[in-house]
Amino acid sequence: MRSAVLSFSGGLDSTTVLAWLIRKEFKKIHCVNFQYGSKHNVYERIAADAVLKYYASAVPCELTYEVVDLSGAFTGMESSLLLSGGEIPEGHYESSNMSQTVVPARNLVFLSILAGMAWSKGIENIAIGIHRGDHAIYPDCRPEFHKAMDTAIYLGTDRNVNVLAPFLHMSKSQIVQYGIANNAPYHLTRTCYKNQPNPCGKCGSCYERLEAFAENNLIDPVFYEEGANNG
């Protein structure tokens, strides 16, 4: 039985990975939402709950969900993405100022926890939504990191767990294209980095998302704050 533990934020990328796992007929999918002290964690959690509720009665697989509290794990680390950090920068996703949003070793920590969960549950894969657009900014989203972690986790779990990153070499636009074709509920997802009810439409993450929909000649179905490019 194909199975996976998925790092699930409720964002566009992880929701599309969930759609991919369902399309690939994984029979058991355990979604894990990490609450790690980021500015947008509260709204990500709301989105994650909504997406999983949407899928719960509509998919032919065992779909489970867990929230993991890592609120103290990144204490003392510098990142504008964290509640303890400065303002979220605005501008294009690949702009140099977006490096302020790097949370040191975040995916290293997440994947290690997911690997332990998978091994203990007898699940042979863990999945993460890293993609080509992340490579310029986030070192723990690059192909060489994925390759190293896949090897380390495979060996560290006595050859029982693999790391899946199905969109590693895809752009955000290509991810949206795949998700639309596979009925991903993008209207329920949350991408914005800011701590506010409606997405800002101005931070790098929002900018990249809006650009991806535009490149597919689509309007993003989520509502942005006044002054942003509302769908």
Language-model features: where?
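Iron-sulfur (Fe-S) cluster-binding segments and ferredoxin-like electron-carrier domains
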Residues: 137, 198, 204-227
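AMP-forming adenylation/ATP pyrophosphatase catalytic core
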Residues: 124, 131, 223-229
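Iron-sulfur (Fe-S) cluster-binding modules
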Residues: 34, 230-231
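ATP-dependent adenylation/nucleotidyltransferase module used to activate substrates
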Residues: 1-182
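Short, intrinsically disordered, charge-biased short linear motifs at domain edges
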Residues: 178-181, 186-195
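Local cysteine-cluster metal-coordination motifs and their immediate loop/turn environment
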Residues: 108, 112, 190-211
